[in-house]
A protein has these predicted regions:
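Metal-associated gating/positioning segment near the N- to mid-region
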Residues: 53-126, 144-145, 216, 248
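N-terminal metal-binding scaffold of metallo-dependent hydrolase/deaminase domains
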Residues: 1-41, 55
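Active-site core of metal-dependent hydrolases
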Residues: 195-316, 323-329
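Active-site metal-binding motif and surrounding structural segment of the metallo-beta-lactamase
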Residues: 38-56, 80-81
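Glycine-rich, aromatic-flanked loop segments that form ligand/cofactor-binding clefts
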Residues: 59, 122, 127-154, 275, ...
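Divalent metal-coordination and catalytic microenvironments
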Residues: 9, 25, 30, 52, ...
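Divalent metal-dependent hydrolysis catalytic cores, especially in the metallo-beta-lactamase
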Residues: 91-116, 130-140, 190-203, 231, ...
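Active-site mouth loops of central-metabolism enzymes
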Residues: 75-88, 158-180, 231-233
Length: 329
């Protein structure tokens, strides 16, 4: 494999806050083997001049749904697109992510009927396409009428469409049924298991404070996944739901933006991994074109208003937890 000697005008290592200047880097194949100011260029290395640029480690998008393109697909999850089109969307989005500096994307549940997301991941891993590498949970596990059941948007206005919208999502009830779903995700190549354990903001039929799976169902999912050595990631917002999930053995919490300081300390002390996703609940910056963002439903807006004070309070708790840097993915 080729060897490169890269001269970086500005260099940020992702560990220290300072940005260094005039740093050299030696890359052998896919591995950075040395970084420093006074490195000599190996004879067999190709010189790459990035003196006009700032060089950073690859970014990680830790919470993404990449099977869509465009802001108008959210409420329907682009249900009219075939699985083949969604697979192509994922490959396209992986390349766009890489061009923007993201080398790894964690896909936390998709709207595929099948497992095209795994095909996209493998095609990129094999070098058929250039793009960010994927870490994938193909289908998030949820309950009827819960956070992952977006068919409820249409159940009273278009029942046939609503019934069809249930098909891409891993929605069921009962411990044995959830065991089956976990085993199926693993069979087709899941890197981790995602649970929609509680309600959310975007879903129309629930509340972020609702716990949606009972303990038997949660234990069935967690124990089945751990038997196969797959980590379990849970969508949850409130302290009660997060503390129960930690007690039952989940490996990571997504969101958590309604939790108390006590719960944040529990996450830190138990070394639970945590992805806050603060951006999705914050107002856009002034220079952002809001027409490019997915529209928020009336239900979403009502919930934001209901939890406005708690979101602001918990945001400071979350930021303090993120600053500690010990458990953040």
């Amino acid at each position: 494999m080729p060897k490169y000697y890269i001269h970086c005008g500005r260099f940020f290592d992702g560990v220290h806050e300072d940005i260094d200047e005039n740093i050299n880097m030696i890359v052998d194949g896919a591995k950075i083997v040395n970084v420093g100011k006074s490195l000599e260029k190996p004879r067999d290395a190709v010189f790459v001049d990035l003196s006009q640029y700032t060089v950073t480690p690859g970014f990680i998008d830790a919470h993404a749904h990449y099977e869509f393109i465009g802001p108008e697909t959210f409420n329907t999850f682009s249900i009219s697109d075939s699985d083949e089109m969604k697979t192509l969307n994922m490959v396209y989005n992986a390349r766009q992510a890489l061009l923007k500096g993201f080398t790894t994307v964690r896909v936390t549940g998709t709207a595929f009927l099948g497992f095209g997301c795994i095909d996209a991941k493998r095609a990129i891993d094999k070098g058929y396409f250039t793009g960010a590498r994927f870490i994938v949970a193909p289908h998030a596990l949820g309950v009827p009428g819960g956070h992952w059941d977006f068919s409820i948007f249409y159940c009273n206005t278009n029942p046939m469409f609503s019934e069809y919208m249930e098909q891409p999502f891993a929605i069921t009830s009962g411990a044995d049924m959830f065991k089956h779903l976990v085993r199926k995700q693993i069979k087709y190549g899941a890197d981790f298991i995602k649970i929609m354990a509680a309600g959310g903001f975007a879903s129309p039929g629930d509340d972020p404070g609702n716990m949606q799976l009972d303990q038997d169902e949660l234990c069935a999912i967690i124990n089945t996944a751990k038997t196969a050595e797959k980590p379990v990631v849970a969508h949850a917002y409130t302290s009660d739901s997060i503390e129960l999930l930690i007690q039952l053995g989940v490996d990571e919490i997504e969101h958590g933006t309604l939790m108390s300081e006590q719960t944040a300390r529990l996450i830190e002390n138990k070394q639970i991994k945590y992805v806050p996703t603060l951006f999705s609940l914050m107002p856009p910056d002034d220079d952002v074109d809001v027409s490019t963002l997915p529209p928020k439903s009336d239900a979403f807006i009502r919930k934001l208003a209901k939890y406005d004070a708690q979101l602001k309070e918990s945001r400071e708790v979350v930021l303090d937890l993120v600053k500690c840097g010990k458990t953040l993915i």
